[in-house]
């Protein structure tokens, strides 16, 4: 419903939604985006009453090294620590692998190393986005099938972007490949 650390007003809105959801028995269905920031996002979300965090990690070597200026090994350590910190706070964790589509296309070894290193972590869903909308249905199906076959015990979601009007086709391809969940917007 929101990203952590945006503003005090945003935190108040998250708190109001979380309180409503808890009163209706839907507390575990309210998710918010958090960051790998040493617990700052987790504290912000916890104060707002959010019980499910979608942690944003880097799904490509380019984003890891270029944006974070971290080695893949260091980023993996940071992600694992953030996951465990969230669980220690009583939160359920999903992991959003930003730029996953480019990771699979240009640095699949990076994606596999991240998933190998987190396969035993307490993550409910691994979210695989086509962040820049670069996929076509053929690559989507191939990349998604690869992950399902390599990691049969993990739950994968596909998150399409519609830059080139392929979001529906790519989502169908992810489902055909065996992905367990999809993210959609209905207008």
Short names for language-model regions:
Residues 1-21, 57-70, 98-103, 127-138, ...:
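Glycine-rich, proline-tolerant flexible connector loops at the mouths of alpha/beta enzymes
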Residues 7, 24-94, 98-111:
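Active-site beta->alpha loop and helix N-cap motifs at the rims of alpha/beta catalytic domains
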Residues 93, 112-130:
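Conserved C-terminal portion of the radical SAM core fold
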Residues 15-25, 42-51, 83-90, 116-122, ...:
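Acidic (Asp/Glu)-rich catalytic clusters
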Residues 1, 25-31, 51-54, 92-96, ...:
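Structural preference for beta-strand elements that scaffold enzyme active sites
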Residues 132-135, 139-187:
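Catalytic alpha/beta core domains of metabolic enzymes, predominantly
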């Amino acid at each position: 419903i929101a990203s952590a650390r945006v503003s005090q007003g945003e935190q108040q809105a998250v708190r109001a939604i979380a309180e409503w959801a808890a009163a209706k028995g839907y507390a575990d269905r309210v998710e918010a985006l958090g960051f790998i920031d040493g617990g700052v996002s987790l504290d912000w979300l916890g104060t707002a009453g959010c019980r499910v965090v979608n942690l944003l990690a880097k799904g490509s070597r380019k984003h890891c090294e270029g944006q974070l200026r971290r080695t893949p090994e260091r980023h993996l350590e940071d992600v694992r620590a953030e996951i465990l910190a969230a669980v220690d706070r009583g939160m359920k964790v999903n992991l959003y692998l930003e730029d996953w589509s480019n990771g699979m296309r240009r640095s699949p070894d990076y994606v596999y190393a991240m998933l190998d290193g987190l396969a035993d972590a307490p993550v409910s869903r691994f979210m695989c986005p086509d962040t820049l909308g670069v996929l076509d249905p053929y690559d989507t199906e191939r990349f998604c099938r690869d992950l399902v076959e390599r990691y049969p015990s993990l739950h994968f979601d596909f998150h399409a972007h519609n830059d080139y009007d392929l979001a529906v086709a790519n989502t169908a391809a992810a489902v055909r490949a065996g992905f367990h969940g999809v993210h959609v917007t209905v207008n």
